[in-house]
Amino acid sequence: MRVIFAGTPEFARVALAQLHGAGFEIPLVLTQPDRPAGRGMKLQASAVKQWAESHAIAVAQPRSLRLDGKYPEDAAAARAAIEAAQADVMVVAAYGLILPQWVLDMPRLGCLNIHASLLPRWRGAAPIHRAIQAGDPQTGVTIMQMDAGLDTGDMLLVEKLAIQATDTTATLHDKLAALGGQMIVQALELAAAGQLEPVRQPAEGVTYAHKIEKSEAAVDWTQPVASIDRHIRAMTPFPGASAQIGSDTVKLWSSEIDSCSCPPDMRKGLILSANSDGVRVACGDGVLKVTELQRAGGKRLPAADFLRGFDLQAGQLFDLPNP
């Protein structure tokens, strides 16, 4: 089976490697154009491009696939490359470009998407972050037959995965990437045998995982302690939960719900203690112990190391975000 692969970040690279390892012929990879990244803002190729080129797979990087859009020459060149590839199917994973109908219609078996949620819950751009943030007990991967809607196509395979109390977006991402890679291999093997059975998504339970914005990073200490703990885990590694204390912004990377109680009249954001064990902060209904922190321009550090270079003390107050 000939497979065109469309994807950009590490989540997609894992699936591409799984398909290649399973012996599928991959004549073409589509990925986003190189972007400036890092402190030097040098152009950097996507994880998918780097892997594809290291395995001598042809790569196309159109800025758009819309023939009537802003970059019609890119779309036309991509169309020619897709036609020349004569693929049976296109696999899409976190690609980042909208696929017009002509793309969906071109492969014999259409386009299959690897989506990191249990559809129809968390359609959209940030399903892993939002599942943790919402306190979902489980998530998973859906292999979907793509249509013109936003993650609305028929479901082909679904696998569930429990969200652990310590999972961050980073750890859950890696688990779901591995699961998605295994599932897309299984889906294509079933497709080759004519054994895939599409199931329509239910109309009930639809939610949207809107893109994570940097403006969401700030911790609201008036919220319940469990909600703040989930927020920190959901914002790790991007954009990183943040707290303001005076003129300093501190990133919060790891936390635990403390067993200490918090009187209802205690000021929210008040530092109750700061020692090698962690920084305990009063929250809406309890106490959060922050165990890994980072100052602006510094490194992520365990609380003990962080406090050697940043003077946090009991009685200080983290700012509350503007309403």
UniProtKB/Swiss-Prot annotation:
Its EC number is 2.1.2.9. (6S)-5,6,7,8-tetrahydrofolate binds at S117, L118, L119, P120. It catalyses: L-methionyl-tRNA(fMet) + (6R)-10-formyltetrahydrofolate = N-formyl-L-methionyl-tRNA(fMet) + (6S)-5,6,7,8-tetrahydrofolate + H(+). GO terms for molecular function: methionyl-tRNA formyltransferase activity. Keywords: Protein biosynthesis, Transferase. It is an enzyme of class 2 (transferase). The keyword Protein biosynthesis applies. The keyword Protein biosynthesis applies. GO terms for cellular component: cytosol. Gene3D superfamilies: 3.40.50.12230. HAMAP family: Formyl_trans. Attaches a formyl group to the free amino group of methionyl-tRNA(fMet). The formyl group appears to play a dual role in the initiator identity of N-formylmethionyl-tRNA by promoting its recognition by IF2 and preventing the misappropriation of this tRNA by the elongation apparatus. Belongs to the Fmt family. This is Methionyl-tRNA formyltransferase. It comes from Polaromonas naphthalenivorans (strain CJ2). The lineage of its organism: Bacteria, Pseudomonadati, Pseudomonadota, Betaproteobacteria, Burkholderiales.
